[in-house]
Amino acid sequence: TFTQYFHDPANQYTISDNCIKHLLCDNQKRIWVGSMKGLNLYNKETDDFIPISTNGSVFWLMQNSQNEICYLINNTLCIMNPVTYVTERFQFGDEHKIYFLYEDNDKRLWVGMWDSGLKWFDRKNHKLVDANLTMENGKNFNNSQVNYIVETLEGNLMLATREGVLIYDRQANRLINYYQREQSCGLSENTIISLYRDKANNIWIGTYGGGVNLYTPYSNFFIPHKPEYKLQKSIGNINAIVEYKEKLWLGTDGGLIIYNPKDESYEYCPLHVPRSVTNNEVKY
C-alpha cells in the first residue's frame, strides 16, 4: 500500500506543490522533497513536512561527502547544512543551464548541463570548469545534454545523453568511448534518461521508450530488457532506477515496476493517484 501526501494551501506543513521533481533519502534516513515550489523535509514524528525553501523549482537533490544537501534551483547551485539549514548559493548565468549533480569517489562535484556537456564545480573559486567531451577522432559531445552520471568500476564516469552513452576518463580529462544504437553494442535507444550502479557493479540504463539496458563490468556491450513485453503493458520511459532488498525498482511513465534479477520477473504496482494529471507516472 502507498500513503499519499498532497499540497494544502491552508496548511504550511504539507508539501509545497503536488508536482514532485526529486526525492532524497539522506544518510540519517530523512526524506527531502523537491517540488515545483520549493524544498520540504519530511517530519516522521508528526507525519508532515517542514518547509525549507520556497524560492523556486527544485529539480535535483543529493548529499555530498560532507553531509551537506546540494540542490538546484534554476541556474543556482544551493549547498545547505542539513542541521542549521544555512545555505550557500552559487548563481550562474543563463549560459549555464544546470541539470544534474554527482559527486565522485574523489569528492569532486560534477555537473551535467542542459546543453553544454559536462562540468565540475570549483567551490573555492565559485565557478564551473569545462570537461573535455571530445574523442581522439574529433567527435564532439561538448554541447550535449547530460541527463545522468555514475562512476564505473574502473573509475571513469558514464554519462547519459540524448546521443547515447559516453565514457569519460576524469583523470585524463577526455572522452574514451561512446555507445549508440546504430553500433553493434546492443544499446536499444540513444536517449538515455537514468543510470544506476547496483551492488554487483552492473550499470542499469533507463531509456526514452526503449526499456532498460544492462551494462556489466569489463564488457563493451549492452543487454536490453523490455519490461513491457513481459507485463503486456505500456510503460513509456524509464525515469529512475533504485536497488532495494536485492530487487530493482523502476519508476516509469506507466507506473512503478519491481524487477527481480534472480528469476528475471517483473511486478507491476498500480498507484491509483486521485486527481492526477500524469496518472501513474513515477519520476523518482
What are these language model-derived features?
Residues 1-284:
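Carboxylate-rich, polar loop motifs that coordinate divalent cations or form catalytic acidic clusters
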